[in-house]
Amino acid sequence: MRTTKLMAGALTLLVLVGGAAAAETVQSSESTVYTLPANVSRIEEYAFYGDGELREIRIPEGVTEIGDYAFANCWYLTEITIPESVTKIGAHAFDSCVSLKTVQLSDNITEMGESAFYRCLSLPEITLPASLTGISARMFENCEGLVTVTVPEGLLEIGDSAFAGCKKLENCPLPPNLTRVGSYAFDKCTLWNAELLPDTLTEIGEYAFRQCKKLTEVTIGEKLLNVGEGAFCDCDGIKKVDWQAKVTRIPDRVFQSCYYIETVKLPETVTEIGEYSFYSCGYLTDIGTFERMKRIGACAFSNCDELVNIGTLDAIEEIGGGAFISDQKLVLSLDGLQHLRIIGGYAFGGCPKVTGLRDLPALEEIGASALDSANIPEVANLPRLRRIGASGLSNRSLVTVGDLPSLEYIGDSAFRNATSLTTFGAAPNVTYIGANAFEECRKLETLGLDGVAAEIGREAFIACTSLKSLDLSNVTSIGEKAFSYCGTLETVVSLESITSLGKNAFEECRSLVTVGKIGNLTRLPNEVFRECKALANVTLPDTMETIGTAAFKHCYGLPEIVIPDSVTTIEEEAFSGCDSLKEIIVPDSVVKMGNHVFGGCRSATRIVFPKYLTYLPGSGVSFCNYMVEFVFPENVKSISNYFFYGCISLKEIVIPDTVTTIDFRAFWDCTSLTRITIPASVTKIDSTAFDGCKKDKLVWVVTPGSYAETYAKKNYYHYVYAK
């Protein structure tokens, strides 16, 4: 049963005419409709805050003000009538009255506070007072059921987020005298034809109409000089934009993701287009002529799939990163743009119809991947270019790069896969060449980088198969595989300034004959000259301490090598397969050697190991086919696995009396071995140590009663006693 309860006397949170206050508040589980006393003049802050029983309230004439949060969180309040006497509604007065369906406002209300009807989810429509001049911030935010708002003609301002999140709001005609729409004011509203923006508007805040899906046209009037970032972004119903205001800058993201925009008319006063302004406007074909345009911001026209024409850019100074990325239909020549200073990263990435990079006297920087898909056969007359970013000119159409006198920085992969590039002009001031900078530039023959004091990154020139000569005399650092697979490279004039050399730096430079003086390195890196089959001349510095793994492996043409007496370590396979070495003398400074260190040095006839080495590394001189003399270290204790394997010219050998062990297949296939002296110190000989030796021709020289004599008898080797 519907019950009406008269609130007898004054409530403690009501102000009576005359100022007296009562002592109690009516509480009743039956009470669903409250009727306030006739002598109430003001409903105070929080008067009914969170009242879970309140369904309807009757406010008498005479009340002039409803205080802040007065009815906030009255979840079951469905209806309220506000009398003509009320002139002010406080902030959050009806905040989160989620069941409120009917509100009748007095036309005498001149002030409604922030968030007054915030999150009134059930409210379908409201008529605002005729005397109201401004809608406060967040007043109807998240009123998800709100469809229609009637606003007075005298309204001047709609505050920030006033209707944000009113997803069903379709009807809210903007009055003719409106001057400001605040930030996020209609964010995510369905919205009707708000394209009818009044001529009086001077300001639209950021993201004011974001995701207003039913907007179809936008006209920016002449007085509307202040439009905020993202004001119309994600309004994918907009098809036409007419910007009449004489602005100099188009805001960031203003029409971002307005996919179906077809026509945009901008004023001739524009000198700058902000970041993401027209990002992903997929149907945009023409943006007009920009004779005064100086700057186009990052991603301003990115993913504009149908964009063909942007007119002249004669005044342009900067094209931001990703400005036109993936605009595959864009037709534009960059030749002769006299004021262009910067082409940002990815600016024209994926733009195959962009052409030209000549006669740009002001150009200082080409950003990462800026022109990787453009049609640019020639780069010429760029006197001020200082920097080319990563993949900046990674371009298969590029044939010639002219002189670049100011160039300092070549980024990673800057010219990677520029497979048609034949000439790179003089660039004497380069200090950095990034990783993979010229990778796979297989036709590159002329490289104007001789003598530059640069740092060269890893794989910078890998597989530049037409390079023939390099002057690296002032280069301080060369990264891993920097010149690997440069198959026609014959001469490296000098490496005398080098302080850092990466592994595999010249790997498989199969035509490389001469490497000039190497700088004061302490370590020669792993595989640095591996498979340099023609290498004939290399000088190691007297600072060298370590020769790395496979450093000269398969340098078949190397006739000699002088190992400085500063070297203490030679790692495994360091000289493996150096077929042309005739004599190998390892200085006594060496105390550590890796396996197979000289394995396969087929032409070496004499090999001298260092005095103080205490072991022979596995396969150390295996397959030294022409070796006839081997000089042991003085203190060696064992002959390791496969050490003399395949030394088919070795006829006679005397094992030092420091040796105690002859290991697995140590002399395997020494088919010419006829005499071996084994001292009494040897106490272990592996059963396979002499496999493949011709037993009928081999004579062991042993000490009477020694382990060697016993072994020879047991295994039927012919032996004689040492004298």
Whereabouts are the PLM-identified features?
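Structural signature of tandem-repeat unit edges
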Residues: 28-42, 52-65, 75-88, 98-111, ...
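Sec-dependent signal peptide cleavage junction
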Residues: 17-30
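Bacterial N-terminal signal peptides that target proteins for export
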Residues: 1-10
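Consensus positions within tandem repeat domains that build extended binding/scaffold surfaces
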Residues: 45-47, 67-70, 90-95, 113-118, ...
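Hydrophobic core
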Residues: 11, 15-16
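Short, structured coil segments at secondary-structure junctions
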Residues: 714-716
